[in-house]
UniProtKB/Swiss-Prot annotation:
Name under which the protein is recorded: Histidinol-phosphate aminotransferase
Required co-factors: pyridoxal 5'-phosphate
Catalyzed chemical reaction(s): L-histidinol phosphate + 2-oxoglutarate = 3-(imidazol-4-yl)-2-oxopropyl phosphate + L-glutamate
InterPro entries assigned: Aminotrans_II_pyridoxalP_BS, Aminotransferase_I/II_large, HisP_aminotrans, PyrdxlP-dep_Trfase, PyrdxlP-dep_Trfase_major, PyrdxlP-dep_Trfase_small
Gene3D superfamilies: Aspartate Aminotransferase, domain 1, Type I PLP-dependent aspartate aminotransferase-like (Major domain)
Record-level GO BP terms: L-histidine biosynthetic process
Subunit-structure text: Homodimer.
Residue intervals passing through the bilayer: none
GO molecular function terms noted in the UniProt entry: histidinol-phosphate transaminase activity; pyridoxal phosphate binding
Family to which the UniProt record says this protein belongs: Belongs to the class-II pyridoxal-phosphate-dependent aminotransferase family. Histidinol-phosphate aminotransferase subfamily.
Disulfide partners: none
Pathway noted in the entry: Amino-acid biosynthesis; L-histidine biosynthesis; L-histidine from 5-phospho-alpha-D-ribose 1-diphosphate: step 7/9
EC number(s) stated in the UniProt entry for this protein: 2.6.1.9
């Protein structure tokens, strides 16, 4: 028998969204940015390709400096990761011994639980109300690490800011605020770093910066926390190409601010259209919406959309089994989605 750790063998693996092998799908299932980055970011790529026999910068210096300019902090307060999932892993490995507690909401990004369990942590799930919101601050004094996403998937709304701040104030361990979707809203929590020395902000370039295929993310915190997390980081955790493109993309803030505004405009149109089509739809601060059709089972809608080459995300979790999650695409992609829904609704 293989000597597999019990905490691994008993942990269900993370289930990613479907990645079709053909290009004839309208892909609204994995919250990717529908708009590509500017062509100019690729201009320096050929020179970097000639250096692939050499290791990349082990600490991603230029990338961190570019991020520091955007975040308005020192690059020494930033750790670069192979996507923000890397930052989540590093945080558990840095702060949580086997058997110690990791806390997170009962409905949130499912990778938190997977990461915590495979590291042998104990789990505390914080209950949310019937609107999938916090009932108050997270009070969990035994938690060495609290994961909290704002905006919080799969609903996509920001959590109550006062509750989050009180969570940071009350926590005896570290609070990691996952801001994967924050650029599609008007609010962030970087100011918490000035008030609390136990806070980490994680960011990704997969959603707002159109680099999901490159895997670039950041952890932002005090220099003390960053120094400790850096000890745990895998050596050369970002390849040369990811560092180059990530650095280049961050220099195009005006372009991406326009993209984010377009996504928000399309999001508003989609929410209004779905409500007209008899969906219950949550307001969203993200690049996706969570919607429940009132005239068909959500699982059947998912299947019938897929038959029409439109992919959305369906979760079998009991609390959201009546919902589908729809990523915000281009206006043309959303038109195709709505046409397909009209067709399905007309046949039911």
């Amino acid at each position: 028998m293989l000597p597999i750790r019990e905490c691994v063998s008993q942990t269900p693996g993370y289930v990613p969204g479907e990645q079709p092998q053909t290009t004839d799908y309208i892909k609204l299932n994995t919250n990717e940015n529908p708009y590509p980055p500017p062509d100019k970011i690729f201009e320096g790529l050929q020179q970097e390709l000639t250096k692939v026999r050499l290791y990349p910068d082990p600490v991603s210096t230029q990338l961190r400096k570019a991020a520091a300019n955007v975040f308005g902090i020192s690059y020494q307060n930033i750790l670069a990761g192979n996507g923000s999932d890397d930052i989540l892993n590093i945080a558990v490995r840095t702060f949580v011994n086997p058997g110690e507690v990791v806390a997170f909401l009962d409905l949130t990004y499912s990778l938190y639980e997977t990461i915590a369990r495979v590291h042998g942590a104990s789990i505390v799930q914080i209950p949310t109300n019937n609107q999938f919101e916090l009932n108050g601050p997270i009070i969990c004094p035994e938690a060495k690490l609290i994961f909290v996403a704002s905006p919080n998937p799969p609903v996509g709304k920001h959590l109550n800011r006062d509750y989050l701040e009180e969570t940071c104030k009350q926590a005896t361990g570290v609070v990691l605020i996952d801001e994967a979707y924050v650029d599609f809203s008007d609010e962030n929590h970087l100011d918490f770093l000035e008030k609390y020395d136990n806070v980490i902000i994680s960011r990704t370039m997969s959603k707002s910066y159109s680099l999901a295929g490159m895997r670039v993310g950041f952890g932002v915190s005090s220099t003390e926390i960053i120094e400790q997390m850096d000890k745990v980081r895998d050596s050369y955790n970002l390849d040369r190409i990811a560092q180059t493109l990530g650095t280049a993309v961050l220099n195009y803030q005006d372009y991406f601010k326009g993209v984010w505004q377009q996504v928000r405009h399309t999001r508003t149109r989609l929410i209004e259209s779905l409500r007209t089509l008899e969906f219950l739809v949550f307001d969203s601060d993200s690049n996706f919406v969570l919607a429940s059709p009132q005239w068909i089972a959500a699982s059947d809608l998912y299947t019938q959309l897929k038959e029409r080459k439109v992919l959305v995300r369906y979760f079998s979790h009991p609390r959201i089994k009546d919902y589908v999650r729809i990523s915000i695409g281009t206006d043309q992609e959303i038109d195709r989605l709505l046409e397909a829904i009209h067709e399905i609704k007309g046949s039911n």
